[in-house]
Amino acid sequence: MAPDVDLDAVAASTPGMVGADLANLVNEAALLAARRGHDQVGTADFADALEKIVLGSVRGIMLSREERERTAYHESGHALLGMLTPGADPVRKVSIIPRGRALGVTFQAPDTDRYGYSEQYLRGRIVGALGGRAAEEIVYSDVTTGAESDLDQVTSIARQMVGRWGMSDAVGPIAVLPPPGQESPLGLDGVAPATRELVDLEVRRIVDECHDEALATLTAHREQLDRLAHALLAKETLDEDEAYAAAEVPRDEAPGVLARGDVPGILPDPGAPPRADAVVAGS
């Protein structure tokens, strides 16, 4: 391992990862170093390996000018709300390089591991996930299919808030829905139709409120949205410092940045147990 590798920095960038995840990271970094002809695994190898694991492999496709610009605004919407929403995880990287199934990605991760969930945090997750769609609405007065995975995440979080975590006054502090992935295929789970309808109404209310918040925040900070999108178009990928600088949001003063020890929770992927404390939004 090269002397420039800061293991504390590596640990800080991998909250929630278990031993197998870290072993995979080290192996991937070693493979990258070997391909590059390096005798030692360096900081850049670790950074690129983490990016590949978390964000996915780069896809060799060429976007049109219009699609590239729209993707930049979509990701800037996610990122700017991550910076401005109280309690949100810090934005670590924003990119408009196509990876996996996404045309762009915004990566957020907390400074420490998280194991609990607060309603404020979960609402912030929904607001941030709706940021890409909201940015498209503001800039283009139209939306695309790029928000598909965002809407899946939004719906899952809101349904669990209402049906499992007691975060709806109308439904009350009871768990009326089964855990994700354990639903009865015939709907024979003992939940009355009227209760299901109430859950649906509350889910829609929460999502609508968060959507309104996303639109209002991005509209109020339109100049910052434009600056961030233009920086993305110029560089394609922005790291944490570059993203906050482009948006002119002081990193240490951003309302989305929590002090250490003041972390309310991390939501796992829909249907999966908690693993890595990271939020990835893509278009």
Which role does the model predict for each range below?
Residues 5-6, 21, 45, 67, ...:
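Single-residue recognition of alpha-helix capping/boundary positions
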Residues 61-71:
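Short pre-active-site segment immediately N-terminal to the catalytic Zn-binding motif
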Residues 1-47, 52, 56, 61-62, ...:
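Conserved C-terminal "switch" segment of AAA+ ATPases
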